[in-house]
């Protein structure tokens, strides 16, 4: 399959690195508005063709799949043009700044007989996949509640709060935090399904160019409840996923490889914390070593993206549906829409 990429920024590097190693995939072209950026990316990843006009690229290269990794508010045009050129589209999150634009993208994909896949990469990390496996085989029991908490210093030297170089995500409703809502929503959706109601709190604790730096939400969903949080002040950085089931509880830090399970034990009740602590300690030590080792090899922290792309290309090559359907993308983004700050909060 012939692949092309539009938008050769930071996240594009992960897409390009993966594409170069996927069997049966030819990375045919790279496009970026900056000639220097496009040429440098093409040289780094040994891609023969580079462009500054995505329409010219689509017409000349005729790719089977296009990766749209431009800033979030600019996905719509390149995605529509890619569908019109007969390509499937893999788009970075958020796929569109409004639910109306996303619905248009999904409709155009259906009309063209193509697939739209949004990068919900954390769904395909090993930890969520292992939790999901235990749920599917009945070991976990029905999910009662899920918690997703991102602690990340976006006010530090990471680009989000630089007044001299405004980050593209600041144009989204909710600012930089909105760039993380698809991660929170997709994980909640994975374990408790589409939301029915959502209550949110958006606040700002520290002076910065960001409109908000703290976010909390509680959702009632089809299969349970969810609590979603983002904090720019809580430290250390972490990405906690906690899933509570009828027979088991799971805790994972998705910035690491840590995953622990807690279940009722057939020992005297006073001894349960002791045995649980022993098992958890062993698991955390193994995860610490695994987290260190993954820093020295690909895909590193982007294991979920690589797995998503591998499954997607495998499905497309077989003429099958990709692992993330259009209905999934719509349901997650409707949840994201419900999480965005209301006018009274802006």
Describe each PLM feature range.
Residues 15, 49-108, 304:
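Beta-loop-alpha module in the N-terminal Rossmann-like domain of NAD(P)-dependent dehydrogenases
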Residues 104-122, 142-145:
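Rossmann-fold dehydrogenase core element
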Residues 179, 185-264, 306-318, 336-338:
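Contiguous beta-strand/loop segments that form the cofactor/metal-binding neighborhood of enzyme cores
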Residues 1-45, 346:
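N-terminal Rossmann-like dinucleotide-binding module
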Residues 51, 91-92, 116-118, 252:
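Hydrophobic residues in well-ordered beta-strands that form the structural core
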Residues 263-299:
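Alpha-helical membrane-targeting segments
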Residues 65-67, 297-346:
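C-terminal helix-rich "cap/oligomerization" subdomain common to oxidoreductases
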Residues 123-199, 205-207:
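Predominantly a Rossmann-like dinucleotide-binding segment in NAD(P)-dependent oxidoreductases
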């Amino acid at each position: 399959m012939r692949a092309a990429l539009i938008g050769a920024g930071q996240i594009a590097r992960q897409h390009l690195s993966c594409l170069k190693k996927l069997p049966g995939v030819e990375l045919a072209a790279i496009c970026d508005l900056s000639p220097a950026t496009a040429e440098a990316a093409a040289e780094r990843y040994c891609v023969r063709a580079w462009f500054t006009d995505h329409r010219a690229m689509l017409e000349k290269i005729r790719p089977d799949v296009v990766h749209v990794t431009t800033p979030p508010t600019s996905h719509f045009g390149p995605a529509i043009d890619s569908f019109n050129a007969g390509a499937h589209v893999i788009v970075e999150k958020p796929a569109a700044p409004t639910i109306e634009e996303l619905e248009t993208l999904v409709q155009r994909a259906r009309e063209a007989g193509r697939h739209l896949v949004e990068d919900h990469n954390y769904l395909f990390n090993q930890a969520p996949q292992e939790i999901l496996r235990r749920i599917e085989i009945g070991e976990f029991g029905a999910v009662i509640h899920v918690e997703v908490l991102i602690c990340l210093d976006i006010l530090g030297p990471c680009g989000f709060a630089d007044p001299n170089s405004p980050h593209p995500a600041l144009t989204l409703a909710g600012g930089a935090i909105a760039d993380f809502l698809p991660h929170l929503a997709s994980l909640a959706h994975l374990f408790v399904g589409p939301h029915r109601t959502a209550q949110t709190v958006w606040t700002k604790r520290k002076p910065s160019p960001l409109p908000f730096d703290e976010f909390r939400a509680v959702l009632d969903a089809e299969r349970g409840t969810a609590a979603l949080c983002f904090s720019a002040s809580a430290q250390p950085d972490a990405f906690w996923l906690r899933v509570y089931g009828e027979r088991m509880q799971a805790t994972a830090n998705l910035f690491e490889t840590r995953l622990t399970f807690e279940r009722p034990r057939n020992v005297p009740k006073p001894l349960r914390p002791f045995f649980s602590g022993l098992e958890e300690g062993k698991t955390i030590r193994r995860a610490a070593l695994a987290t260190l080792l993954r820093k020295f090899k690909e895909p590193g922290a982007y294991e979920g993206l690589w797995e998503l792309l591998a499954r997607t290309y495998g499905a497309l090559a077989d003429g099958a549906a990709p692992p993330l359907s259009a209905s999934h993308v719509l349901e997650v983004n409707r949840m994201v829409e419900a999480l965005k700050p209301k006018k009274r909060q802006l």
